[in-house]
C-alpha cells in the first residue's frame, strides 16, 4: 500500500491528502513532526519535510517529495476524476493559482501566522510575537481580497471545475481556519467557495485532524456554517 508521510495542520501535506482522496487511492498515513529529527524519514527524503509519498510499483517503490510533485503524480496516474481542466489555458491557470498559494501566500501569510502559532509551539521557540501576527493578518486580508475578486468571476478558483488550484487553496485556508484566523462575516465569496470545497469527501477527511494544545473553532467541521 502507498504510504504518505505528513503533518496534519500543514498546507502541503493536506494538498497531497486531498489529491489522493479525489483519485480514490488508498494510502496509509504516517504522521511526521517536521521540527524533530527523524533518521528513518531523512533516509527516505532528502528534504526531510513532509509530505512524502512512497508508492509501491511493480519491481520496487517510487518516492515522491513535495505537494506539487505528489499532486501531479497522482493526477497523471489515472484519468478518472481529473485534477486539471481540459483546456490548456485553464490548466495553466490552475497551476498558476496553486503556485500562488504555495509561494506568495505561504511567504506572506503562513510564514507569519502558522510559524507563530504552530511552529513556535512545537519547537519551543519562545512566546508568540503579536506584531508578527498582526502583519500576517494584514497580509491575509490582502490575499482574501484577491480571492474574492477571482471568485466573483468563477465558480472555482481556476474556472468551472474543481482542480489543483482549489486543492491548494482549501489546504492553505483550512489550516488558518483551524486556528480561527478568518472572520468569515467579512468574506462572503470566499466563504461560499470554502463551504462547497469542504463538502467534498476528499476535504471532509481533514476536518477531524487535531493538534495537542489546540482547539478548532466550532464551525470548523460544520459544512454549512
Predicted regions: what they are:
Residues 1-130, 134, 224:
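GST-like domain detector, emphasizing the conserved glutathione-binding G-site
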Residues 7, 164, 210-211:
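Short, solvent-exposed turn/loop segments enriched in Gly/Ser/Thr/Pro and often Arg
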Residues 29, 160, 186, 206-207:
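A generic structural-conservation signal
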Residues 34-35, 162, 212-213:
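Positions that flank functional sites
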Residues 75, 172-173, 207:
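Active-site-flanking alpha-helical
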Residues 101-199:
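GST-like fold's C-terminal all-alpha helical module
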Residues 200-201, 205:
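A late-sequence structural motif
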Residues 210-225:
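Acidic/histidine-enriched, glycine/proline-rich intrinsically disordered or flexible terminal extensions
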Amino acid at each position: 500500500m502507498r504510504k504518505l508521510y505528513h503533518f496534519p495542520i500543514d498546507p502541503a501535506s493536506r494538498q497531497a491528502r486531498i489529491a489522493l482522496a479525489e483519485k480514490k487511492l488508498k494510502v496509509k498515513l504516517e504522521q511526521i513532526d517536521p521540527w524533530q529529527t527523524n533518521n528513518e524519514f531523512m533516509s527516505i527524503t532528502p528534504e526531510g519535510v513532509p509530505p512524502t509519498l512512497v508508492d509501491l510499483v511493480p519491481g520496487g517503490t517510487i518516492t515522491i517529495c513535495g505537494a506539487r510533485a505528489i499532486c501531479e503524480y497522482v493526477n497523471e496516474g489515472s484519468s478518472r476524476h481529473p485534477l486539471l481542466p481540459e483546456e490548456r489555458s485553464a490548466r495553466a491557470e490552475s497551476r498558476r493559482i496553486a503556485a500562488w498559494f504555495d509561494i506568495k501566500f505561504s511567504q506572506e501569510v503562513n510564514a507569519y501566522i502558522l510559524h507563530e502559532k504552530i511552529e513556535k509551539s512545537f519547537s519551543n521557540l519562545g512566546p508568540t510575537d503579536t506584531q508578527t501576527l498582526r502583519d500576517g493578518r494584514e497580509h491575509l486580508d490582502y490575499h482574501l481580497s484577491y480571492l474574492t475578486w477571482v471568485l466573483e468571476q468563477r465558480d472555482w478558483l481556476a474556472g468551472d471545475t474543481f482542480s489543483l488550484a482549489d486543492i491548494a487553496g482549501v489546504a492553505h485556508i483550512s489550516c488558518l481556519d483551524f486556528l480561527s484566523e478568518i472572520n468569515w462575516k467579512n468574506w462572503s465569496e470566499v466563504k461560499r467557495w470554502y463551504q462547497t470545497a469542504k463538502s467534498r469527501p476528499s476535504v471532509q477527511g481533514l476536518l477531524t485532524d487535531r493538534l495537542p494544545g489546540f482547539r478548532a473553532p466550532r464551525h470548523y467541521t460544520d459544512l454549512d456554517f
